[in-house]
């Protein structure tokens, strides 16, 4: 479905993403296509809004869509300066809000926010929260998902929860621990006013989101 169709049916918020390399997907042999990338998408939408023309220069008789445009950033990246520079490009190209990749270490997230502030980049940032389900899930993301760094102590806690569950015949202890850890991070982000909000990537376990928010003390 095109962006125009989304706008017509009332969806007025858009997240511009370049996308991951196909090597981490279901068809690793396919060719990556980054035309346009996230910055290009933002520039295209912003130009459409300003000129009332599509990307080919044709006037839009019904008026250009005006999306609340967003983009993403990886707070854990080496060298982090590349992400700061890319973030600046995205904001200057029209991004009004930013969603981060999953974060698991609030101290490193704070350092990233300090760098954003020092660079003079003004935008609304939402921290990405991924509730972990198992130690294997955390290890897989560390090895295969760019910009993700789950600390070893979290992995060890999940492994210990699995061992305890096996010993006592209790299912789901690692997932319960993942819910607790996600709630703890959200509560700290809220209480310390670290950023403008969070977005929870539950990855097939969306039913747990209300529980996570409740444990974090968040009322909607």
Describe the role of every protein-language-model region.
Residues 1-43:
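Flexible, glycine-rich active-site loops centered on histidine and acidic residues
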Residues 1-7, 81-88, 111-117, 134-140, ...:
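Catalytic cores of alpha/beta
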Residues 6, 90, 94, 127, ...:
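Conserved, mostly hydrophobic/aromatic
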Residues 10-12, 65-67, 95-96, 121-125, ...:
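Short, well-ordered coil/turn segments that N-cap beta-strands
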Residues 15-16, 96-105, 174-176, 197-202:
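Catalytic beta/alpha-barrel core
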Residues 19, 32-62, 72-77, 84, ...:
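Active-site pocket-lining/capping segments in soluble small-molecule metabolic enzymes
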Residues 32-40, 100-113, 133-136, 203:
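Active-site glycine- and acidic-residue-rich loops that bind
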Residues 192, 199-220:
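C-terminal/domain-terminus segments
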